[in-house]
């Protein structure tokens, strides 16, 4: 339309007019679910909890001549339309997040109305809504009556064709290079604006009676192939990353990478692989092989659910470690209680095989060792030793497959509490484990080792660098004992109902006794270090399992999922490394964390290239 001049006396937006009616609360409709899936596919780098995507027009950010309907996606004009002072606009609910990289929306012209004085574009928060987009500073629009583009000015520039009833106009914002182009009926019209600021809102404006438009923020497939355009820019950004110049420092760069890989292998216990890598690259290994294998063995025990044995082994190889880390010790004991409920800890699997020593002070007891009891000089370290979890249950509920743990072979001979001949228990090579232990001192450099052929794990099969040998009998996080009862008393609606400890009364009593001792340990730690809410929550969550006849199907049953052993395993492994003055996290993981944080900072700073340089794209 003809160029318009700014009118300082123009009216202000009306707040709270919801003539279109907002969608009601409750469960997401199928349409909303499909929208969420499409937006996630288009903009995977966007954290919608921090920076929500536009999904509709805002009933609180529009001029009073604008009416909304159909879920705030349809806009109609309800003013007089006498002149430019009657123009009215509406902004979307949220600005375009920089992490989109490329953002696109479409507007269908349902009716051009009397004159077709319509504008489609972008505007910043606070721009006057009594104007068409493009007429004011930080406002940009493409107008249908004359095909002109308006860039923060009342004077338009020739840009594209006019548009009318039935046309679909798209607006694409490139947050990487700060440009914007429009499409008409699926065809690009070329660059309209450059040097765009951040935090712009999709905006439409109408001026004459009868004008109606519908927005598509992803509710329906777009006419324009925006995903092809995104692929083009993703290739450009990734090409920039790949071509980053390092030739002048190539030798230094390679040495850094080799050290990062070596330390990662050592951290997670890939002993043989780390040794072979060090031999090929001449990279020194900071930790002795014996210590690596000791950590590997401890991790293996934790991931199998044999936490009592893991505690005893840790105390043997690294005396004083757990007693100086009461939070870690308490977390391990709580996890042991959970595994006793699960039926995987040797305390309930091998009741009849405990030696006199273990009966007197068995490895599974929650009591602190008399030799290493905590003193007032010990620090109560909550952050370094315990991840944010309850009983080793990560705060983010994992949905990973429960069947990732291969079946164990036979009973353990490395611990007096696991020497049962139960067919479902796990062991190590006696010649490489038990015998060597008898003749070696209890230290972090003990030569108790298991042969590489038994203890080394293949990285592609065992994430986290530890052998995952949970029994294939694990179903939904529950250990199915040989004596699991499935008679009439354990049937529920014709389906087998799992019972605590397979219905074994002695094992159930052992769990209850262990729980009392665990409660006593909690009270002891409370007296020495003060009350810890995290400890209280761990204890409550663990004890809650006993309130249900089928703990695996109860509301807190996710604790029994084998995947929940991993944060406990990681915390213990990090504490061992830290006690040896080694990094508790491998430098490779720190570098990945730094890269991820840099990308988040780029998004907050409005640098759109962060969307196409995601760390996950480089992890294979």
UniProtKB/Swiss-Prot annotation:
Keywords: Acetylation, Cytoplasm, Nucleus, Phosphoprotein. Residues 35-222 form the B30.2/SPRY domain. The modification Phosphoserine is found at residues 361, 365, 367, 369, 422, 451, 453. It is found in: Cytoplasm, Cytosol; Nucleus. It comes from the Eukaryota. Residues 1-34, 347-459 are annotated as: Disordered. GO terms for biological process: cytoskeleton organization. Gene3D superfamilies: 2.60.120.920. The modification N-acetylalanine is found at residue 2. Residues 291-348 form the CTLH domain. Residues 253-285 form the LisH domain. One of its GO terms (cellular component) is cytosol. The modification Phosphotyrosine is found at residue 362. The SPRY domain mediates the interaction with MET. May act as an adapter protein to couple membrane receptors to intracellular signaling pathways. Core component of the CTLH E3 ubiquitin-protein ligase complex that selectively accepts ubiquitin from UBE2H and mediates ubiquitination and subsequent proteasomal degradation of the transcription factor HBP1. Enhances dihydrotestosterone-induced transactivation activity of AR, as well as dexamethasone-induced transactivation activity of NR3C1, but does not affect estrogen-induced transactivation. Acts as a guanine nucleotide exchange factor (GEF) for RAN GTPase. May form homodimers. Identified in the CTLH complex that contains GID4, RANBP9 and/or RANBP10, MKLN1, MAEA, RMND5A (or alternatively its paralog RMND5B), GID8, ARMC8, WDR26 and YPEL5. Within this complex, MAEA, RMND5A (or alternatively its paralog RMND5B), GID8, WDR26, and RANBP9 and/or RANBP10 form the catalytic core, while GID4, MKLN1, ARMC8 and YPEL5 have ancillary roles. Interacts with RAN and RANBP9. Interacts with the HGF receptor MET. Interacts with AR. Interacts with TUBB1. Interacts with YPEL5. May interact with TUBB5. Interacts with DDX4. This is Ran-binding protein 10. It comes from Bos taurus.
